[in-house]
Amino acid sequence: MRKITFNTIYDVLRFAISEEQSAIRYYTQQAQSTTNYETRTLWEQLATDEIRHKAILSNVLEQHLLHNKDINMVINIDPVDVYNSEEESDLNAVICEAIRAEEQACKMYNDLANITEDETIKRVLRTIASEEKAHRDSLINDLNTHK
């Protein structure tokens, strides 16, 4: 477990955008490497959703839609090396790592929503958190079909 401390909301947004980009790259890579149609479709959908999340977060950051107040936010991250791995792994292990990543993303967006005062942005962040939870649930369902 690694602790990351953020000093401003913009720091959190930049980190979230970077994580979304890693997820996009990873899910796209997984979609291209699997021969299972259902799993490929799931990976492609996850990548598409993460592209949308990145665009939303980038817009919030670039348009200064969120007040960049000073914060002291600590996020406990369990490193998900699967995003950075180029080697092929067991599909179940890959899915389990993706599940952990989605759980962490959900928590991060909920934590950020809790310290945000703007109600519109708060709803956006909670929606993204909800979608990350739905990703986790989809991955769990896919994992169960492979057991």
Regions found by a protein language model. Give the residues of each.
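Membrane-interacting alpha-helical segments
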Residues: M1-L13, D81-N92, D142-K147
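Alpha-helical bundle segments that constitute or directly flank the non-heme di-iron/ferroxidase center
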Residues: K3-T34, N92-I115
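Short, structured helix-loop boundary elements
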Residues: Y10, R40, N92, K122-L125
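Alpha-helical transition-metal enzyme core signature, strongest for iron centers
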Residues: A16-Y27, W43-S58, A98-A105, L125-L139
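Hydrophobic stripe of amphipathic alpha-helices that form coiled-coil interfaces
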Residues: T34-Y37, T41, L57, H64, ...
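Carboxylate-rich helix-loop segments that flank metal/cofactor sites and access channels
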Residues: N59-N92
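Preference for long, well-ordered alpha-helical segments
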Residues: K107-K147
